[in-house]
């Protein structure tokens, strides 16, 4: 074995020592056809022998058929493309690397390129599923909350395997496998409730099962609108079957009182997020702007308004539920979580989104230090959703250094992230920034999105179920009584004004003057359960 060694505890010298080959390295596939002929066999040894004692330096995942720079000569690869995709999950490297070539960007199957764009390079958990040295190997790895199951066949015969995957029981999966012509194909399947799955592996072929981390829109049949009101600083739910007419589930009364969950005895800006595993998360601003009037504190603000500004606060309220009825809640104080944030002026309008690259939930929000201008920041929440794992980092700042940007809302469409936010540039209103990355690189667009002559804030974008239409809604606080406005788009360039609640096609049947909220998709069953629960309450 090239660079052969035995474990000597060198890992204790990290970061000066990262790893070593100590394996039949992948360049041998280029040097000699014999190694290409035996690639599948050797790949089914690595998990049992080399990776059993640690990471290896191995540049796997060849997508060239001919292993030279031009893909037109030299040795010939015997394994299938999906076999190669599986090795991106199967092999354990200290710093993950792949043997892709520049020409692969134009000649490799698109399904393979899309897989390689999203496959994680670090793993949080590994489980051995099945295998036999030199014959086949099936390994499951978890990144964040998403599982990948990789399988390779080291033989020249068809293998039929009976797998047990309890962590994926009943879930929808993306299934990468070889078709009859040994070409890569991507299918969608739903695993049985018992987690059992029969897998067929073609000779020197492979397969990858990927937990679907994206909500299946076809299963959705209703909409849930979360909002708050200034007079109560509490949380409200409204439901719609068609995305046009919304009815409050508790007849205009709070479902959770702000004084029961927040340090400042009130919440604002509730944002609800539905994770693909069915868990619901809500993030809210821990702030009551009328606490003095309500007799909840002796001063207008929690701290000196001259020093820390209007509406100063220091944290959020985070809530989590499996059924939209029973919720856990936690207060998260940024100043108590990270050193150096004692002078934080505000932490407003938190929203949640899943970062596919990081494999975890990102929270992004408005923040300022002292009474300086407001800017947009992001961090990552922990797995229990009761705290922050990473220190806030800058997400976006308005190009005019004298102006504030607040209330971000991020929507991914295709391979782009569209961030709508409020620009305090003249009359406050909604603008858009676009990036290829979720947490950086947003390009400023100067056009105003909303048609409102009066001040508005709190943009939230949501998709109409079964249609290529998106609705951006916003809180028009500059009118009296305040109301929500709506605009619709198909291209994120042109926006059609739908008017306000009860002044156009959008209706609020049993509530008025909602403030800063969000809309998500829910199933018809979930909508009916909410209606029934609160009717009986």
For each predicted feature, which ranges?
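Solvent-exposed beta-strand/loop surfaces of large extracellular or lumenal domains
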Residues: 175-194
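C-terminal beta-strand-rich structural cap/linker in extracellular carbohydrate-active enzymes
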Residues: 188-216
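Beta-rich carbohydrate-recognition and catalytic domains
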Residues: 216-347, 353-454, 464-470, 474-537
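Histidine/acidic-residue-rich catalytic or RNA/ligand-binding cores of hydrolases
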Residues: 8-20, 111-112, 429, 480-484
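Aromatic- and carboxylate-enriched substrate-binding clefts and catalytic-loop regions
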Residues: 1-78
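Carbohydrate-binding surface patches
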Residues: 132-169, 204-208
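Generic beta-strand/beta-sheet core signal
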Residues: 2-4, 152, 176
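Glycine-rich, aromatic-lined ligand/substrate-binding cores of catalytic
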Residues: 66-143
């Amino acid at each position: 074995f090239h660079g052969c060694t035995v474990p000597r505890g060198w890992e204790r010298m990290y970061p000066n020592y990262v790893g070593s080959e100590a394996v039949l390295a992948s360049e041998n596939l280029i040097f000699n056809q014999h190694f290409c002929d035996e690639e599948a066999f050797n790949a089914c040894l690595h998990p049992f022998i080399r990776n059993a004692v640690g990471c290896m330096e191995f540049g796997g995942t060849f997508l060239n058929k001919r292993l030279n720079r031009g893909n037109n000569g030299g040795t010939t690869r015997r394994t299938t493309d999906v076999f190669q995709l599986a090795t991106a999950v199967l092999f354990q490297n200290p710093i993950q690397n792949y043997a892709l070539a520049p020409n692969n960007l134009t000649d490799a199957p698109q399904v393979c390129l899309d897989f390689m764009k999203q496959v994680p390079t670090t793993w949080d958990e590994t489980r051995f599923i099945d295998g036999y040295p030199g014959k086949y190997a099936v390994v499951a790895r978890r990144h964040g909350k998403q599982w990948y199951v990789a399988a390779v066949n080291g033989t020249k015969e068809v293998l039929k395997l009976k797998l047990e995957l309890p962590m994926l029981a009943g879930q929808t999966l993306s299934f990468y496998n070889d078709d009859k012509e040994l070409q890569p194909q991507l299918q969608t399947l739903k695993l049985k409730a018992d987690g059992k799955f029969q897998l067929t592996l073609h000779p020197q072929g492979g397969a990858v099962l990927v937990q679907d981390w994206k909500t299946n829109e076809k299963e959705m049949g209703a909409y849930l609108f979360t909002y708050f009101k200034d007079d109560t600083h509490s949380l409200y739910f409204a439901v719609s079957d068609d995305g046009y007419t919304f009815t409050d589930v508790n007849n205009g009364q709070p479902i959770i009182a702000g004084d029961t969950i927040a340090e400042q005895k009130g919440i604002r800006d509730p944002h609800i997020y539905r994770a693909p595993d069915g868990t619901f998360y809500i993030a809210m601003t821990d702030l009551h702007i009328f606490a003095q009037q309500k007799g909840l504190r002796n001063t207008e603000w929690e701290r000196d308004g001259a020093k820390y500004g209007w509406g100063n606060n220091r944290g959020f309220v985070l809530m989590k539920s499996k059924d939209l009825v029973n919720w856990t809640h936690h207060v998260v104080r940024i100043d108590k979580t990270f050193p150096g944030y004692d002078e934080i002026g505000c932490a407003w309008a938190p929203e949640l989104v899943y970062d596919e690259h990081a494999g975890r939930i990102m929270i992004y929000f408005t923040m300022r230090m002292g009474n300086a201008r407001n800017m947009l920041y992001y961090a990552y929440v922990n797995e229990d959703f009761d705290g922050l794992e990473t220190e806030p980092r800058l997400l976006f700042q308005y190009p005019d250094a004298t102006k504030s940007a607040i209330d971000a809302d991020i929507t991914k469409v295709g391979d782009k992230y569209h961030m709508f936010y409020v620009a305090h540039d003249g009359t406050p209103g909604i603008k858009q920034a676009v990036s290829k990355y979720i947490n950086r690189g947003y390009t400023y667009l100067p056009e105003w999105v909303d048609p409102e002559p009066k001040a508005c804030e709190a943009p939230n974008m949501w998709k109409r179920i079964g249609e290529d239409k998106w609705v951006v809604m916003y809180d028009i606080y500059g009118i009296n009584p305040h109301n929500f406005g709506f605009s619709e788009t198909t291209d994120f360039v042109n926006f059609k004004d739908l008017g306000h609640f009860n002044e156009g096609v959008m209706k609020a049947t049993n509530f008025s003057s909602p403030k800063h909220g969000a809309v998500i998709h829910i199933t018809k069953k979930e909508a009916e359960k909410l209606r029934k629960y609160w009717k009986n309450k």
